Curated annotation (Swiss-Prot):
PROSITE patterns: TLC (PS50922). This is Translocating chain-associated membrane protein 2. Glycans are attached at residue 55. The keyword Glycoprotein applies. Residues 44-75, 141-159, 210-214, 272-287 are extracellular. It comes from Homo sapiens (Human). It is a multi-pass membrane protein. Keywords: Glycoprotein, Membrane, Protein transport, Translocation, Transmembrane, Transmembrane helix, Transport. Belongs to the TRAM family.
Amino acid sequence: MAFRRRTKSYPLFSQEFVIHNHADIGFCLVLCVLIGLMFEVTAKTAFLFILPQYNISVPTADSETVHYHYGPKDLVTILFYIFITIILHAVVQEYILDKISKRLHLSKVKHSKFNESGQLVVFHFTSVIWCFYVVVTEGYLTNPRSLWEDYPHVHLPFQVKFFYLCQLAYWLHALPELYFQKVRKEEIPRQLQYICLYLVHIAGAYLLNLSRLGLILLLLQYSTEFLFHTARLFYFADENNEKLFSAWAAVFGVTRLFILTLAVLAIGFGLARMENQAFDPEKGNFNTLFCRLCVLLLVCAAQAWLMWRFIHSQLRHWREYWNEQSAKRRVPATPRLPARLIKRESGYHENGVVKAENGTSPRTKKLKSP
């Protein structure tokens, strides 16, 4: 892992060299961009990597506010923050997770899952706080009608656009991390599924100008995922601690219901009642019946798939639990061997002395002297 003291050197730009030094390589690239800010010739190009592009001034009653829309230059900004995320990933891994896992003495399988949950706990916790702050300051919680009113939401505030760029950067960085972290082949399909699922939903909300609805749905989803991975960390620390899993199971079903309700309310009813329903990609308007059906189908299919996996996992867990209980009941108790009766011819022994049947010691026969 990056930033560690290494005792073994690898050939330059070899596979092992890149794996063990990928965070250092990313840090060097980020440093080059930051150095570019110091010179007037390269400052404009450096700002292209660091700051969101496509800003416009929107006049208001008091003054002007700066808003943003998306474009191809966003890919450059996302690339820069992919390297930032790789560096932060390595810092969390080395200075937090590795120190904790050494004390727990986990197996290889549990160690891999512990690292995965540890990284996602940090990410989900940060994203929940950030997303909640954006939603509250922009007034999306107090005014639910703003999720579909004035669509298309082409002009985004700075914090909304920056949030989406960082989200895309994080989930894109998770793809090469599968290679850098040497994830087991059995785990790669499962992780690819939820990485691609997040990328499709976040990019879809960003490109289809459904950013307000996307923020609310991400807030709900990330809150549930944070609870799940926190429960898994506590389980790895103490296998008897499963109380948080019960809380997560209750929250999971409620979250699926809320996500489906909000999606149907905003897309199926809110956007359907808007007057402007013409397909106009140049103006960012995708409010047509076909687009609404596709978005609703995607959201409903994703929630149904997550719910099916949840039910399947719960049934398997209960089946294993009842099998263990039935196995314990089938184990026969070890029979006690009957006490072995000792046949005594006359009297019995007590403390090494022969006793008569009436409890008295037999008198020793005196020998007559000749």
